[in-house]
Amino acid sequence: MVNTVAKPEFEELRPGIKAPAKETILTPRFYTTDFEAMANMDITENKAELEAILEEFRCDYNRHHFVRDEEFEQSWDHIDGETRRLFIEFLERSCTAEFSGFLLYKELSRRLKDRNPLLAECFALMSRDEARHAGFLNKAMADFNLSLDLGFLTQHRSYTYFEPEFIFYATYLSEKIGYWRYITIYRHLEKHPEHRIYPIFRFFENWCQDENRHGDFFDAVMRAQPQMLDRPRTFWQKIKEIPLSLSGKKWARYFMVCWVPPKLWCRFFLLSVFATMYLNDLQRAKFYTALGLDAREYDREVIAKTNETAGRVFPVILDVDHPEFYQRLERCVENNAKLTEIAKQNGGFLKKLPLYLSNVWQMIKLFLIPAKEPTRVAVR
């Protein structure tokens, strides 16, 4: 008698090559930006710290870390059913996010090479790290008889345009929250090795230090641009920066960057990153259960640590202890579960509309929770 392992069905581009997950508001995004503005960025105010970070990047502490050992050389058919599906999704999302970082950093290094060589080399070395991470994750997917065609992703994924300032806010938070996600899982599994279902988790301690160093780089760049943080433009600086063209794109940038206080953007990106992670992880709570983690407790710890870390550079942080903070996020979790059920039943947009509007309302109310002044202490 032959045992058939319960394996989830995934759409494939061709045998063994998984079709990319459908793009939604919660999936990892690919970014592009104003490369000319990046090249013209003045970093003299914090150049010494950036040069020190560049020296760290050059050391390449993890050059020999991402090497698969004999523990990978086995069948993984015992990871089956829902756990297998969720783990493959975890690997895919992680690989896509790392590859997105590689593409952005590589393009920035190429565009800035002759104009801003210090930043260009930093971006080049960060792209090296991101490529290494993405490749390691894609090889892990292959252990489950699937992998991503990263060239296909490059050509067919839609790219989201962000102003340079927004790139720095978003990537800083992405790297720092990545650090806290990886180190929290690693520390948990060190205490509970019986839940280490796959050897990739053994690599998370050193891996997360790449994320931490990348976050420190973006921290240093923002400190070199204090108008992004706690030194908003003066009225006369705003007048001087009025666009001398009728370009709608330039005028949109002018109003968003010059007239919206940086504290509001910091709050917006903190909330966006935290809400996205919370909604994604609660959709996949069974994956964290397989690791011996409670998804809610895990996310709340990661959010608290990332929020505290962000306070080292951002002028404000979120009040994640406010009683409404998680109440409203939970309402969004409930709404998303209902949206998933409607989609399974091929329900139309009108059925989904009240839930979409409810999610928007919850986000508005979350944004309006008064922010907190950060305590400037290092987080370990």
UniProtKB/Swiss-Prot annotation:
Keyword Iron among record annotations: yes
Keyword terms of this UniProt record: Chlorophyll biosynthesis, Iron, Metal-binding, NADP, Oxidoreductase, Photosynthesis
Record-listed E.C. numbers: 1.14.13.81
Protein name according to UniProt: Magnesium-protoporphyrin IX monomethyl ester [oxidative] cyclase 1
Pfam families: Rubrerythrin
Record family assignment: Belongs to the AcsF family.
Main function: Catalyzes the formation of the isocyclic ring in chlorophyll biosynthesis. Mediates the cyclase reaction, which results in the formation of divinylprotochlorophyllide (Pchlide) characteristic of all chlorophylls from magnesium-protoporphyrin IX 13-monomethyl ester (MgPMME).
Taxonomic lineage: Bacteria, Bacillati, Cyanobacteriota, Cyanophyceae, Acaryochloridales
